[in-house]
Amino acid sequence: MKEEAFLRRRFSLCPPASTPQKTDPRKVPRNLLLGCENELGPITPGRDMESNGPSQPRDEEPQTPGSATKVPLAEYRLCNGSDKECTSPTTRVSKKDALKAQKENYRQEKKRATKQLFSALTDPSVVIMADSLKIRGTLKSWTKLWCVLKPGVLLIYKTPKVGQWVGTVLLHCCELIERPSKKDGFCFKLFHPLDQSVWAVKGPKGESVGSITQPLPSSYLIFRAASESDGRCWLDALELALRCSSLLRLSTCKQGRDGEQGSSPDASPSSLYGLPTSATIPDQDLFPLNGSALENDAFSDKSERENAEDSDAETQDHSRKTNESGSDLLDSPGGPWRGTTYVEQVQEELGELDETSQVETVSEENKSLMWVLLRQLRPGMDLSRVVLPTFVLEPRSFLGKLSDYYYHGDLLSRAAAEDDPYCRMKLVLRWYLSGFYKKPKGIKKPYNPILGETFRCRWLHPQTNSHTFYIAEQVSHHPPVSAFYVSNRKDGFCMSGSITAKSKFYGNSLSALLDGKAKLTFLNRKEEYTLTMPYAHCRGILYGTMTMELGGKVNIECEKNNLQAELDFKLKPFFGSSANINQISGKIMSGEEVLARLTGHWDRDVFIKEESSGGTELFWTPSEEVRRQRLKRHTVLLEEQSELESERLWQHVTRAIREGDQHKATQEKSVLEEAQRQRAREHQQSLTPWKPQLFLLDPLTQEWRYRYEDLSPWDPLKDIAQYEQDGILHTLQRETMSGQTTFLGSPDSRHKRPSSDRRLRKASDQPSGHSQVTESSGSTPESCPDLSDEDFVPGGESPCPRCRREVHRLKMLQEAVLSIQEAQQELHRHLSTMLSSTVRAGQAPAPSLLQNPRSWFLLCIFLTCQLFINYILK
């Protein structure tokens, strides 16, 4: 075979006089890396690349410069060191040619290995997984670091930006084992079986010293993942990197040279569906190695630099072709699916649970500014067009403030899975109350969004391993209207709505009204809940202590279940005490019947009293434990934000406010307002009306709707992942990936492994529901048999007709089961209504004869007649 002939050319020290000893192809990568225990090893194609080229008979050897010269058999004795009499000129020439050919082969092989390593480290498609992990140091303390797993190496960075390299772990000498732990999360250990160092000497950029962190062990590392599912995914990925790294192609396009076989797209499992990451790495920043250093290392021997120009030209030409083919694949319409890069919000500011954060004392300097502003106002005036001073501004946009209601979105996930309508309403009510206890320090007002301003973020649900995406846009400036859309299709809920901000001035107080409705939809049940918002009331502007409260009545209504919740946010009375601040009362009703009553404080404890039992219990409290359970919010990486995204748009104003420079904040704010006026003038001059990018106005309902709204229920057999790109929510489905991607079976099918040139999975890629039975925890864990993922790919090459029939039959069976389930739920709902009506009718006492006014009237007439007759008879 070609590979065997190539090995004979490379490892023999003389022309092939006899059949050389057979070389095991599996040992070729090891032979290439002799003496490189502490250096980064090249990624070898593996043994299954031997069959890519056409096979060749063993007795036929390819012509080489050494084998082209025919040498008599007697002269081959020169190859034996003891036969010194074989020194003919022909023999010397043959030996020189053979040595030259061997050096050429050695140099080419070393260049090939070096180039292959360089391609593997710089090609982002070979990244298996990237996520944050906690690593235990030598001092038994834990630190959170960013880990990037590539075939054969594990790179550790300080932050997701891949700027501060900590170290590189060489996986070819490591063993992997799961480690029990009493703490939360999932532990595993990478260690050297002979207690030797597992670290590489240099970093990917040639660094010799890593970033300063706590000292890490030299012969092992103990990792901790956030959850068991994350840890299992890391185990799968590490086992693949440890045992099957030779099977990982660098890239389909780089491997499929002209005339070679085996370069089909489904032949390279080059990437994995990793866990949802808190941030992803820009492709150009993954491994910016110095190519010249690698080339110099390939020609480290002085004798190897002979004829290097021709080889370099050939290498550059091949590299150019490789890069062109790679870019063509990425730019093609059917290329990899890329999502937005999200980074975890490091700090979150929470106000105090009492009323101290709602009270503020205005300084004398700011009071003078307030008086200048108040002279221009009249009672009842709308403040939407009034420019407020920067010291009353909260350093974030109103679009970002509207996202405060989704830090406890896991309550909506539980509500979507709840079967009882009354319990669903209570969970929705708990979620609604969870959005109010986060208060800014002092009385602050968020920025008025610029027309066309957008804001994107998302939350990771560790329990369900899903994401909640939040997208908002300012769709109107006069009046100011903010539209938003929230989606978590995997957990089965979506929310949309628009808020019109209005403000009224009343002399010593003002009110900020949030006019509008939000619509919560449970996708699997086709239920819609309509919600309204309270208003913010600020008093003590002219005299007294400046205080901010919430007031007004709020309704949460589900028309399908005939359930309704009313909440009354009460303002503090004029002579009230501190116990009267932030009071709330409410009730849950089914039609006209009151099921439960609520009392308490919206920023503290709320109690519920069930009318059926009469007992009172704690309904909601923002305790320390609840505050620790807040979901982590991830925002878009600043480099990927557009010019009109909130964080990037207001970054200079925010920085100035946090630094206390009110003058600079006012200047930066004026620049943004003037730019907005300039854009408005340009639209007027061009006679082209401005149109929102992500939302549109429904002409029938006059409601703002998300352009890319998807209210279809999540299908675990069809849907793989939900991700966001440029404000557009996409759902990755198996039909869209067929013909381009195949799947590898894994113990946890939430983490799929597409085998095309798939890049590192972005933070916005949401993991899918399960399509396999193994370790499945999806909504229908036992609804599909133990089939491989390829059986579910329509148009795939591997499934047999029987498997396709099985898949089709399972889909039909699932649809039938779902329809039966819906019918049962509808029947159960009707029966419950009839039963409750019957019970109420049975409990109601039968009306007595004397309770009828007509009976009393007839009785009076009868008594009157009786008295009259008795009088006459006497």
From Swiss-Prot:
Chief site of localization: endoplasmic reticulum
UniProtKB keywords: Coiled coil, Endoplasmic reticulum, Lipid transport, Lipid-binding, Membrane, Phosphoprotein, Transmembrane, Transmembrane helix, Transport
Listed transmembrane segments: 855-873
Subcellular locations according to the entry: Endoplasmic reticulum membrane
Single GO MF annotation: cholesterol binding
Residues reported in the UniProt entry to bind a 1,2-diacyl-sn-glycero-3-phospho-(1D-myo-inositol 4-phosphate): 383-388, 445-448, 477-478, 669, 673, 677
Protein name: Oxysterol-binding protein-related protein 5
Species this protein is from: Mus musculus
Gene encoding the protein: Osbpl5
